[in-house]
Amino acid sequence: MAQATDVLVVGGGLIGCGLAWRLRRKGSSVILVEASDINAGASGQNAGSLHFQLEHRFLEQDDASIRQAAPIVALSRLAVEDWRGLEAELHADLEVEMNGGLMVAETAEQITLLEKKQAREADFGLKTHLLDGDEARRIAPYLSGSILAAGHLPEEGHASPRAIAPALARAAVAEGADIMTHTRVVSVAKAAGGFRVGVQAPGGPLEVIQASCVVLAAGIGTGRLAEQFNLHLPLFAAPLTLTATERAAPFMPHLIQHVARRLSMKQTHSGNILIGGGWPSRFAQRADGGLNLQARPILDPDALIANLTIAAEVAPTVANLSVIRTWTGATTVTSDQLPLVGPVSRTPGVYVATGGSGFTLGPTFSRLLADLICGDQEAAQALAIVSPDRFGHLNSFMG
C-alpha cells in the first residue's frame, strides 16, 4: 500500500530540509527522501557565505546579463531578514555572523564596475556603500594597500554549512516530517490527485509514495530527476574548490569578495580562514568518457594556487597562515546563472529548487516555496525572477 503525503521533497540539503520544516509548521504532511545523508551535497560543502551584494559571476558578464540578474537583489533583501531570525526560530547555534561584507576593487576600471553594481542594487532597494581605499582599511585594517575602493554592505556575513541543514532536518522531524535517507527515486507515474513515486534504499523493498506535489531539490541530481517527470531543465554541475587555513586570532570579521576576481574569504568561529570564490576543480570521468558526478571532483592545483595568491594579495596576513585543508565539491548552475525555484507550469504539482545561491538564499527559497505550495500567490511574485517557466520552451517537444 502506498504512503500518502501532501508533499514529497526530494533532496536533504538546506532548501529541502527547510521546506519540510516550513510545510509541517503550516500543517502539510511531508515525506523527504535523500539519496545519501542529510547535508551530504553542496549545502554542506560550500563556504558558508552570506553574500547579498551581486556576485562576481554576474558582474563578469555583459551589461545585459547584469541587468537580467539584478532583480535577484530583491530576494537578497528578504534573505537578510530570514537569516537574522533563523537561529531564534530553530533554537540552534548556526554560527551566523552578520558583521558586514566588503567587495573590493584594485583598479579604476574595477571601481567603475563597483559603481555600476551599486546602481543596479539600489534599483531593487539594496543600499550598499561605496568606500575609498582608506575608508575600507579603517574598518578592515587587514586589507592590502592595493585596495582602492570597496562596496560595503553591513548585513553580509557567514554561517556554518555543517550546522544549518542538520538543524533544519531535526526541526522538521520534531514537527512530524518523515525523513528517509539513503533512499532514491526509482519510478514516477502520474496518478489521480498527484504522483505515485517509487523509492528504494539499497537492498530494500520498493516503497510507493502517493504525493499531491513533488519538490525536486536534489542539487546536481535535480536534472536527472526532472527527466523522470518528462522535463528538461538547463542545469549543469559545477565542480569547485575551497581551502581552510590554520586557526588564527580573530582579525577578519567581514566577508571579503572581489568585484573582478574570483575570491570569497572569511574567518570562521574557530579562527580558520575559508578561501574560495568559484575556482574550479575537475570531474572524474566514467569508463565511457562521461562525467562521473558521483565521485568527488579532482583538485586542480593551478586553480588552488591562483585562489590563494589572490587571497594573499587582498589580505596580506593570510600569506602567513598555513593551509590545513583543501576540498572539492559540486554545485548546480543554470544557463543564465540565476537559480531555478518554483512550480513547473507544464507539469502541475512539480516544483524545482536548485541552480545556485542555495546557501545565501536557501532559507528564503524554502519559506517562499512553502507559502506558495500552501496557496500564497504573493510568494509567486517574489519568486518570479527565478521561475523555471523562463525555460518552458525547452519542453515544447516533450509531449
Task: Spell out what each predicted region is.
Residues R25-N46:
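Glycine-rich FAD pyrophosphate-binding loop
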Residues A40, E207-H254:
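Central helical "cap/lid" subdomain
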Residues S49-E135:
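Dinucleotide-binding Rossmann-like beta1-alpha1 core, especially the glycine-rich loop
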Residues A92-M103, K117, F124, T128-E175, ...:
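Helix-loop-beta segment of a Rossmann-like dinucleotide-binding subdomain
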Residues G151-S212:
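Helical element adjacent to the flavin cofactor pocket in flavoenzyme catalytic cores
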Residues T309-G399:
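C-terminal catalytic lobe of FAD-dependent flavoproteins
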